[in-house]
Amino acid sequence: MKSWVRVLLVLCGLALVPVIFLPMWRIDLVAPQYPEGLRLLIYPGKLGGNVDIINGLNHYIGMKTLHTEDFIEFTILPYLIGFFAAFFVVTGIIGKRKLMYALFFLFVSFGLLAIYDFWRWEYNYGHNLSPDAAIIVPGMAYQPPLIGFKQLLNFGAYSIPDQGGWIFVSAGAILLVCFIVEWRRASRISKGLAMAILVPVFLNSCSSGPQAISPGVD
């Protein structure tokens, strides 16, 4: 692999280490009665922000309360991020293209699985409502947006990556660039090697002049 690709991979791996301790995602809630806003912070290993206030509000509309211990993801996610941080660094140091390919496909697969898991949690959180809630709006669901803005009754909900999330996404984008560069470079090398093998064979098969006919042979 190119030297600058290897350096970028090592830097990405080092940048992923603080992600373990930073919030990866945030959901901001804005309403007239809360002009300063409420914020739910999602860390790799816990929930943070105004969790208690949000739980109190959600109780009235029948939503489940949020507790870190209810999510197995918070147990394994810090280790997965640590694994990818180490994988980035090792790949950059060793410099093997196949290692980078494996890293790329694992990283993309993890990202897609994480997005699906987050969407599934939001769906269950917003649709599985208690029938004994103090406030029931027929046909109303309170699923937060996966990303972007959504109006939920008198609350405006904004769902966006936080510090750790942006670092994680940036590492993925840099990995994609490195993957494309090395894939194209490997393709050019393969074509050049094929030509280097085929051209001498082709030239050797061509005669420089007419050959005499050998009686009893030709």
What are these regions (language model features)?
Residues 1-7, 66-73, 95-102, 153-163:
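Membrane-interfacial loop-to-transmembrane-helix junctions in polytopic alpha-helical membrane proteins
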Residues 22-29, 95-100, 175-194:
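Juxtamembrane membrane-water interface segments of multi-pass membrane proteins
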Residues 11-15, 72-93, 166-176:
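Hydrophobic alpha-helical transmembrane segments
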Residues 2-13, 88-114, 191-194:
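Interfacial segments of alpha-helical transmembrane regions
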Residues 21-73, 119-159:
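Long, glycine/tryptophan/cysteine-rich extracytoplasmic
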